[in-house]
Amino acid sequence: MARVCDVTGKGPMVGNNVSHANNKTKRRFLPNLQYRRFWVETENRWVRLRVSSAALRLIDKNGIDAVLADLRARGQA
């Protein structure tokens, strides 16, 4: 399963570890993903999403109904 946020689409990024001697080795920056259940009042059920911390803030700001409507418009839910 991919490490991708269901709401924002954020995934791993690639960068470098940089040592004190300025040696560089490749590494991955993983998004802060959490499985969360959200109660959808209009549907009277729980919805389980894998979301990043940024997506949690987005859901707090816009509401779960607006976020789910956007997901369905994109064809992801």
Curated annotation (Swiss-Prot):
GO terms for molecular function: structural constituent of ribosome. One of its GO terms (biological process) is translation. Keywords: Ribonucleoprotein, Ribosomal protein. InterPro entries: Ribosomal_bL28 (IPR026569), Ribosomal_bL28/bL31-like_sf (IPR034704), Ribosomal_bL28_bact-type (IPR001383), Ribosomal_bL28_sf (IPR037147). It holds the Pfam family Ribosomal_L28. GO terms for cellular component: cytosolic large ribosomal subunit. It comes from the Bacteria. Belongs to the bacterial ribosomal protein bL28 family. This is Large ribosomal subunit protein bL28. It comes from Variovorax paradoxus (strain S110).
